[in-house]
């Protein structure tokens, strides 16, 4: 069975694996403050797909560095979606 198929016995989907990946990535990222909450949520599916929200805190306080680190992390997460055969879509 491929990772994109639903495993009925263990209830694992590619979206669950993606959320788990994001959480582990953030937990081990040196600039993420893992002493504070890391939360990844997915809302109910609608005509646009699934909305995934990612909440985490960065150790850096300098605004410019903060923005650079956050952008790097989000870029990595977006690029990794294809590994899980997920497509990223942003609605205006």
Language-model-detected regions and their locations in the chain:
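Structured, soluble regulatory/oligomerization domains located on the cytosolic or IMS-facing side
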Residues: 1-92
């Amino acid at each position: 069975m491929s990772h994109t198929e639903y495993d009925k016995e263990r209830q694992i989907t590619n979206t669950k694996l993606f959320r788990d990946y994001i959480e582990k990535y953030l937990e081990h990222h040196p600039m993420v403050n893992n002493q504070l909450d890391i939360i990844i949520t997915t809302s109910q599916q609608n005509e646009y797909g699934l909305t995934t929200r990612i909440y985490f805190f960065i150790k850096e306080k300098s605004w410019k560095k903060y923005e650079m680190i956050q952008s790097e992390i989000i870029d990595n997460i977006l690029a990794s979606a294809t590994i899980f055969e997920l497509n990223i879509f942003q609605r205006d």
